[in-house]
Amino acid sequence: MMVDNEEINSLSIENILERINKSSNINEAKSLCLFASSLFDNNQYLLIQRYLISIKERDFDISIQLFWRLFNNNSFKEYIVLVVLKFLEKEIEDLEYYDFIKKNYRDQFQKIFIDSDDNSTNNSSSSSNENKKNKRSYLKLNTILNKLTKSLNHLSFYISEIDNLNKFFNPITFLLNNNNNNNNNNNNNNNNNNNKNNSNNNNKNNNNNNDDSNNNNNNNFLKILELIQKSCQYLNENENYEYSILLYLLIKGKFENKIRTFIKSSKKEDQDIKSKIKRFWFNGIQSLNQYKNKYSSKIEIEPPLPMKSYFDEDDYDQKQQQQQQQQQQQQEQKGSKEDEEDIEKQKKSLTSEIELFLLPINRFCLPIIFHIENEEFEQLDIKGNSGSGSDSSSSISKLEIVDQCWKYYICKGDDITDESILEIQKFLQQFADSGKHLKRHQNNSILNFTINLLSNPEKARNDYFDRNSEGNGGDENDENSQESNDSYEFEIHLGIYLLSSLLYISSWRYFKFLVTGSSNIEKQNIQTIGTLKKNQILLFDANFNSNSNSSSGSNGIINNNSNSNQQSYHNNNNNNNNNNNNNNNNNNNNNNNNNNNNNNNNNNNNNNNQGQQPNLSMITHQVLYYSNVDDESSFDDEFPKIVFTKQQTEAIKHLTLCMECFNDLNQEPWINDFKRILSTTWNNSKFYWLYNSLADSHYYYKLDGANTLIPIGDSKKRLFNPNDELWFNRLLLNIGMTNHSEIEDSIICLLEILISISIPPPPSSSSSSFSSSNSSLNNDLFNQQLVPSKHTFKTIKPYLTVFSEEEILFWCIDTLATCYERLGMVGEITVLYQAYWNYYKSRFYQIINEIKGTPNQNPNLIPLSNLVKKDLQIGYFFPRFFDYIINIEMLEEFCFILNKGFKLDILQRNQTVSSNREMIDIIKRHITITTSNNNLTIPILLKQFFNEELDHFLIKKENREKQYSSSNTANNSGVNNSPIHNQNTDVEMNE
């Protein structure tokens, strides 16, 4: 049907549109629309009608041209936003950041993406069809779409028609796909151009076609960036920043390669595109900060918990007093005290805040940030806050963004894989390369700084200090002074990122060795699961057999039933070799090999049924015990006799690097930045392994004193689960071994461990009654002793030993005995010596010789402490002797001493004897009673002893703290100026 132009001229625009819509012929409708467009230029209805017709005709190239006309027409501003958001709605479930929050942070997801007004609607009953249709109706995005649709009610007919054709054509999808196809075609054409068989003319034609295609492709790319920016501008005006950043992240991900190519380009013809990409990026940064400012206030974040740090040891007591006073005032005002669950919740919120906002910054800013100059930030002056009432003076710097990008990598505490390390390595390498122009040096190896965190992390640290130990290599003058300052600032930031990353990785690799027996990190060979009823940590390693039955327990589990852990260090290697042999056999097709496979599988099943688990390791360090050795003593150190396996040697390398980086970071110019990292980013229980490695590095390198009390929050037990205390016990054990300055605190730590773990019964034998003959004394009581560690060496140096509950028990008792010895508590030492009698026998006889005044005959024995010697010169004093001493050989020796005329003060205050013979009779009666009592065993006595000792030291500590607190209160109130008050205080203290 032909279009009558004269008739059309006489019709109004409404009539023309009605006629177009009623037309059943697409060609007629198109002709009417084209002719009417010449009469009514830029009419919005005719424009969108033409757009609709082009889609129906499947002429998508024309559709894109018309879509850009719609985009440039201000009347379609909201419609364009609607199109973009509908595309986002379709893609949203596949977006990394959206999925990350949805899966990991439900509470934050509700606050950010869920429309509270729609919650009731979403929760109400509705038909299944409606639920399928509106599966995301609870999102704020749905509210935004509804609002836009209502504002576009005058275009509802066209929007509905276009939506019905969406399966054939979506402008955003078409542009993205077309861009990728053009890139692939250009690459293919470039490959063809390199073919020697192509003629020169063909090459010219192809080059021309490539240029045209590239220009068109680049124009569409820039238009897409502009399209997204305008859509995000609309969202930001309505404070919907969360969807702005999703759009920015989506487009940045789609054009990652193109953006990287242009941002790195130095070609003159690419500079215009490069500047527009930067404008897009800066607008994205602005949206990210607006998003963070909005939702960080809605997500309740408490300040980090107070921590005792290595750095401020001198003024720590003063700060602690101030904090205690402030806490007391707050408690009086509130009338209640926050419990540990609330504090843990606050710390979790802090961690959530870190990951919630660092992830999008990291994904959006890298690697673009490395190609942005500081001056560009200063010129654009991007603000950290926006909106009414905001602080417009706070601007964002380049290094601030770089810092946030880096922190994302080191805030993930519970799973460090090869992929994680390579991401950190890539970041550090890109950052180092971005500062090449600031470094002036004649040595290219210094300029081309190469970082390899997996295979040679020590070299990265050494190379960093080498490149900064030598001069700039250039002449110093005023012109270069600014460059020198910029270079210095850059190197400082590179240092904090590199050294902290090395500390982070080396700590994990050392910890991995402790748990799995190997510090190697290979692809997908380690997973961490931090959730059982006891919050146990499971580390699965490729080196260990993963085919065990569920009934035999999981490999690598840290548990309190550690009998299976008492194996040699070489068992794992043997098991690995067996498994490798089995795998090799499985690859053969011979019948004999199949038979071998069956045998091997049977062997594996037998091993699994035995519940074998990988060895755990720990460091032992007998500093207190060997501090009795002076320079003049003859002492044969057995440390050279200890043979470290390859895996142990590798683990010590990581521990050494951990210590070196820690020492580096505790110096200027990094100490303040490192404090902030420890007090915020790493101030969380999931970084227990990092503090574990830091503690071990201190123990290994003999950093004795109060600074071995690592910063683990205001209450040490909050960092570990008290229901599964094995790791916590091991930490306290090492503190007890090395803490010279607070012996009584170490004793409390050790006693808490000993109460929490089980003491196994000693080897049993047939019970026998006591008779007066000495030969009959060799009975059950004599045999009641525990099995000591098989890894005891006479050395002052630390070394690795098996980590098991039995090993913890031995070293706790051993360390407790040395703590008692340093306090001169000889009787308490004697009680502990019964637990491992054969091991401590020689030391017990040193005490006996000291009582008798007999000099030590063996110069290689560790001498008793000076305080023990001084007390024994007065006499052996232990009023609880008959409550806890049941070892027959000990009792015989004390009878022998009494026969020699030496005095023992071992009776209660209300008991007296007239002669040593009477005391001997009491001891013999004691032997008779104890041997006839089957319930009187070493484990029972030790448990009773540990509880009694802990109560004693806790009461003593409480009284000491009360006295300290009352003294501080008096000093702060000024009462201490009164002579009367001072006099009364002295009387109280003397009492």
UniProtKB/Swiss-Prot annotation:
Superkingdom of the organism of origin: Eukaryota
Cellular compartments annotated: Nucleus
Q: Origin organism of this chain?
A: Dictyostelium discoideum (Social amoeba)
UniProt entry tagged with the keyword Nucleus: yes
GO cellular component term, pick one = nucleus
Residue ranges annotated as compositionally biased, kind Acidic residues, are 473-484
Polar residues biased stretches: 964-991
Task: List, as start-end ranges, the regions of compositional bias called Low complexity.
Answer: 319-333, 549-609
- Region ranges (Disordered): 180-217, 310-345, 462-484, 549-614, 961-991
- Identify the InterPro entries for this entry: Integrator_complex_assoc
What keywords sit in the KW lines? Nucleus
Keyword Glycoprotein listed: no
**What's the stated role of this polypeptide?**
May be a component of the Integrator complex, a complex involved in the small nuclear RNAs (snRNA) U1 and U2 transcription and in their 3'-box-dependent processing.
Q: In its UniProt entry, what is this protein called?
A: Integrator complex subunit 10-like protein
